[in-house]
């Protein structure tokens, strides 16, 4: 069925709520409004306001309440309205949610999913366009994932909700309206922690996640017209990282370019580069390169396109690798 990224998430939430009465949604404007991106549209009407709960604008309280519900046997799903709004909840997520497994020796579970629209592409400035994923990927006790397609949005939200671990679920907001085919009745083709090889290639490996996967695939098409084949990998899981899939590719291509919207400095690309350098040093034909946002907040709408990684910047990095 052809559907949008947002509609695929909606169906995933609906199916999870149908399957388990303990699945409860919490967030700002998710009920009557259906969320600012309409991901939860009609769910309150169909399941009631005791399972789709409109909350005050207080992210720390939202996550704290959901955490308490998770400890009592529910499977809450929180929507943080915009990426920059997650910071008031940072203490709850990092100091409480992430630590409960270790604090109790694994005896207490916290099946909590925190959905966060992230990244640019919609012309919104600071607080509404940010890439905070690395803060959570750095935190032991959290799974951090990001789908890039409607099909993965559906399957990954179902998998995340079913886990007994807390999951931070980053949704690339500029992909909410992307359309592709989704099999709502099939089983997931990959575990939640596995990366996906989107295109096979021999000259260089390009790793991306979230909103930059489509950009990397566009770059691969342009490279093919110029006689170069790129292997594009959708990371999907930001923590844990599927190093095996990346390493297998790099051992074949000898070159690696990592793409993300977040600033390059101390970004997730730095961790991937370090791990691949440690593991594949003698296979590398060129330094590992990174393409990311600049070391500034997301700029105003008219400047945003210059801030986000684009095919030209990716291809320039690939050319540097091939010339080494």
Predicted regions located by residue number:
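Thiamine diphosphate
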Residues: 1-166, 170, 175, 306, ...
